[in-house]
Amino acid sequence: MAKLTKDELIEAFKEMTLIELSEFVKEFEEVFDVTAAAPVAVAAAGAAGGEAAAAEEKDEFDVVLEDAGAKKIGVIKAVRELVSGLGLKEAKELVEGAPKAILEGANKDDAEAAKAKLEEAGAKVTLK
């Protein structure tokens, strides 16, 4: 296998999407047992700055159904599609018992896709 130079690697990274780069970094971390997170400096970091950094590093999200809205049937169908093995009765109880977590510990892409699907069905959803 030919060895790539740093410049060739940079050019290859420029052609990748952010999602592809994110997946690359995760796989790189697993293969080489390293982490790309920079050490956090404890001194003089403002509370707002610390919260923003924590939000950027978050990789697991909970999709919380806040309100089903007027189109409950569509929301129930969307919940059944998102949560495997959920029957009609369970999905209805979940939707009517809002606010409830629909997905817990989902990655960012799955959480955003679930949020979009539920909002399209008429629900009010938050990611935590």
Swiss-Prot record:
GO-annotated molecular function: mRNA binding; structural constituent of ribosome
Domain of life, source organism: Bacteria
Keywords per UniProt: Ribonucleoprotein, Ribosomal protein
GO CC annotations, alphabetized: cytosolic large ribosomal subunit
Pfam families: Ribosomal_L12, Ribosomal_L12_N
Paired cysteines (S-S): none
BP-aspect Gene Ontology terms: translation
UniProt xrefs under Gene3D superfamilies: 3.30.1390.10, Single helix bin
NCBIfam families reported for this sequence: L12
Subunit structure: Homodimer. Part of the ribosomal stalk of the 50S ribosomal subunit. Forms a multimeric L10(L12)X complex, where L10 forms an elongated spine to which 2 to 4 L12 dimers bind in a sequential fashion. Binds GTP-bound translation factors.
Similarity remark: Belongs to the bacterial ribosomal protein bL12 family.
Purpose: Forms part of the ribosomal stalk which helps the ribosome interact with GTP-bound translation factors. Is thus essential for accurate translation.
PANTHER family per record: 39S RIBOSOMAL PROTEIN L12 (PTHR45987), LARGE RIBOSOMAL SUBUNIT PROTEIN BL12M (PTHR45987:SF4)
Protein name: Large ribosomal subunit protein bL12
Species of provenance: Corynebacterium glutamicum (strain ATCC 13032 / DSM 20300 / JCM 1318 / BCRC 11384 / CCUG 27702 / LMG 3730 / NBRC 12168 / NCIMB 10025 / NRRL B-2784 / 534)
